[in-house]
């Protein structure tokens, strides 16, 4: 894995430098999150990438049936499995400030420690296994997932989350996206 940006010629797009199509997407994103994340400024260089990301992300949030804390555990599991420090920091902030992830669970996730909450531990483990096995999780983990009270549709929504986070995680790898100040307190060392 490279520690330097592999995309060299494309630069972050600002509202001032955006084409009309890019501007509409970025403006919508700013209205949703209150600022222009560096990740979005990079993704919009290929407008279909940001558009697909925002659409899928919104559907996962609104339709997955996961509680907000569970959604964040899914996103953290994927981002960690993909080695994306930007998204791990960003979702750590959301987990801490907005989604109600218990502090001990967030600490365990960020530090690679066992998660004491069995439902969230099962969700985290299965999600990571889906990523690491390219969609072929261990049958025992799936059985534990059902036993924890999750349904088959939840597994499909994990696939959606993996798809969405792959767009963001891989874009961040290619650009070596600079962490936004908003997420600085959650930066991984």
Predicted regions and their residues:
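Hydrophobic alpha-helical segments
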Residues: 1-189
